[in-house]
Amino acid sequence: MNTRLLPALTSVFFLLLIGLSAALLVGLATGGGAQPLLLADPGAIARYGLPSATALVHLGAALSIGSLMMAALVISSKDAAFNSSLVVAAIGAGLTTVASVFSAFFTFAIIYVEPVSFDQRFGEVLWLYLGGTEVGRAWLVTIALSALVTVLVVMVRSFVGVFVAGLLAVASLWPLAEQGHAAGTANHEPAVSASFTHSVFAAMWIGGLAMVAVIAWSHKPPAQKFHTVLSRYSTIALVSFLVVAASGVTNAWLRVGEASAMFSAYGALVAAKVVALVLLGGAGALYRTRLLASLASGVRGSTAVTMRVVAAELALMGVASGLASALARTATPVPEIPATELAVATPSEILTGELLPPEFEWSMVITTWQLDLLWALIVIFAIVYYVWGHLRLAKRGDAWPVGRTIAWVSGMVVLGITTNAGLGVYGTYLFSVHMVAHMILSMAIPLLLVLGAPVTLASRAIAGRKDGSRGPREWILAAVHSRYLGFLGHPLVAAVIFGLSLIVFYYSPLFSWALEDHLGHQWMIVHFLASGYLFAQSLVGIDPTPHNPPYPLRLIIVLATMGFHAFFGLSLIYGTGLLVPEWYGAMGREWGPNPLLDQQNGGEIAWGLGEFPTLALAILVAWSWSRSDERANKRRDRRVDAVGDTELDAYNEMLRARAGVPDRPRKG
């Protein structure tokens, strides 16, 4: 291991910790987040210990996620800095694990109504807290995932291992997003999505810059090499800045409410965090406008100047992190009372945390909105990057069909509407509306996205790398050509997954999980999109695929899928048992059809509406078949024009030989 690595990491940690500690103490004093509790006060150690430990949890997560991101997207696997990034990731994940243990204990001390005593009942009560309460289970999951990341990072040295460890590190932040202010707010699902998105991209931003500093101070790369690292990180930092800003505004909007509430203690801390974010954005602009150019030109002292800016930025990031931890312990202007604690709660509030919306009308599919920031950002960035790819090809004179761009943009717009508008809102209360969203997510949107040929565009528009690192192009092509996706992308396998998942999802606890838990809801959307995309790609995909089944087989698969959809729809239409009766049957709706009739309406939608995309698939398969035959005939005609019809000549010679007729002399 590089002997300068630990001193460099210590310097980075010190810079972050200085800003974090100062901002946290000032924030707790301003917002009253560490004031003694009126009942069963656990003491100052727990009151100050919880926000401090939680801040270290996020700091450790930033180090692990940011370092793994740099290894996956920035650093060459041949470079010594690659191994250093994994060491930093292991240290960060270990810090997250230990800090999560302390956070879980301090949370237990605060919510436990009796003074904590280490007697014979302590273990029993602690385990009841960890296994029997939502907040306890959340901390337990975070501890387990962080510990797993620590072990995994120590063991792996491959890109695949880095990718898996990175996913687990990101997943460890989800339980934290469901705690704090997001747990009690009325807009629970938008708050959780915004908090999770904010945490992940803040971790990428902070941890990535920390790794840049570690590389500069421990490996001392030449200016040109450091320019490559910093320029790649700068692009990631720009995206992270935009996402952190958007998610921060969303969080503030959900918790501050009226503009006058900005004069509260919570509003003052939000304003301070906005100032820190603006200053960090200015530092990012300085990188992209001046410092990177100086490094590229080899200006003497440019690396030293850049690192002074990096050091100041790290301290400022610590300030922003400290303010965030203080905000998490500060009372919000918008009251946060879970529905289960309301004196009088409606069935809808108990189940969903929200009041029952007005009676549904189909116009509300467009007029009713509830922001899901995660999917809104995915849609925006997917459109922006696709259009950028199209324009980049056009700029260098390469043609790209406009129809593909229209298909991709249309699919993404429909995805944004489906996840953020009326279908997403009312699907929670009406099975029929949920089924409309299902058909669109699994059939209409994937077909449009497949026709956009995103892999082909990415392979043409994104420059490849030659230094042993993996950029977006390398990751996309590696995924496309992996054996795993090759197996899942086989038409028969994709068809089985697409059809069988209907039965498995709706007639298992998965459906209940998707309704009751926001994580389950997000998984449901991803599953519908992924299974539909694999199915459509295997049949009519433009992007390269290892499988090229004959067109008659493709048509048979489409027809079989239509039959399976009809069977599924009929089972719902004539079924007399209610799916998830403890949800749809207990919602307390006084408008619309009764739950069983609504479910039967959903069956009609699954049968009728689902046939339109399937019919479109069948038409596209037939059209592709026809075009394939035309291309084959044209190739044959060109070959005949060039060398003659050798097959026909051989056949005629065989007939003449059988008839005893001598061969005719060839012309020319």
Can you say where each PLM-predicted feature lies in the sequence?
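Alpha-helical membrane segments of multi-pass proteins
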Residues: 1-668
